Amino acid sequence: MSEDALASKRRADEEGSAEGSAPGKDDRAPSKRPRNTTSTTTGIPTVSGVVSSLGTNRVSSGSPTSSSAAAGAGGGPRTIVTFNLNGGGPRLTNNWEELAAFLEENTADLVCFQEFRLPAKGVPKCKKDDDTGRKRGQLKDDTAADRKDIALLQKTLMKLARRLGYRVLMSLANYKYAGTAVLIRCDDTPDGRGVRADTCPAVDVFYNITEDGELVKKHDREGRVIAIEYPSMTVVMLYVPNNGVKPESFKRREQWDSVLRGFVNGYVKRTGRTLVITGDLNVAHTDADLTHPSYFKGMFPAATPRNSGQPGCTPAEKERHSLLLESGGGLVDAYRHLHPVAAAAAGGSAGTNTEGITWRGTAGNQVAASGRYYGKGMRIDYFLVSKSLAARIKEVKVFGRGADREGFLGSDHSPLMLTLLPSS
């Protein structure tokens, strides 16, 4: 068995996911976080001081006129990229040149990464199940391997972010698992490029959600949430846990989905703000979002039919996603808004549905076609927007395509970019 195959098997054993390279590769959901809505002054987390602390958990340019000027131009990002890296370390090591070229060519106002998979700082020699003293916005730094990860991040993503005018914020798990990061475009860039006229600095950043509609500063234990409040909209980036194949993982995912629906309903009711929810939501809503519907639906029979099938396309997950779209006055799947499901695609015979697929299976070691999921894929990465934003959806670009994952930049997920028209 190859080193890659061993690593894949080890992750599956540790995380309880379905055998093989299945989307998401985990079935854990975080425990419900306690409410904590008090403002903090702990400073934005840094990586060895590379990103300067801004004094509070606010991201701003320091210009007293920037927010008001931006609000006049819409008060929020017009271009957002979401990308499940399938490991920050591997992408920064093996695919940095193509990832850097992608970020330079597509200078989005906000870039959202999932599966960043770098460990959070804790007390010296802490074990992976030890939450003591965890600083989830900073990298673990007490071993030579940790310091190597920090050096890698500094010379790649952090260096590029400074040049392009981004702040880098992270939310990390205890070990190389899950985790998220964002690049937020600001207007105090070293090279004077400045923020574009159609965007603005973020107002505030949060790291978890509650079922009653609150954004909170305390990080999700597995680093699955980063939410950014702009003057006129809130962007919530999520890495949703995989449904798994065991009853306990079904229950955890059901709880996660319930909390998310509660958050959307409560937040919109309380604030009236426009929402964009993006990231790896780990669900293919309809058969049109699967390359091989019959194959996926025939996988992993469960005691309850509602939980039978490949994680990501079980009846229970699809039903809950439909309920999410009805939450908060209604959310619009931006890709499907522009690309409605054709009647012919609804049945979804094998290999028929290929457009918009965001996750693709891995090729076999010796023969590509021997890979369990090779040639198969799902659309599980999304931009869900409030109905009031639907008229502004200009484009949702899925950069990757095909069984051989062209444009996937080394990941098993494709990057996506949402472009919004200017507000009237």
Where in the sequence are the language-model features?
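Short amphipathic alpha-helical segment that frequently serves as the phosphate-/nucleotide-binding helix
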Residues: 93-100, 253-261, 415
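Structured beta-strand-rich core segments of catalytic domains in phosphoester-bond hydrolases
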Residues: 117, 122-245
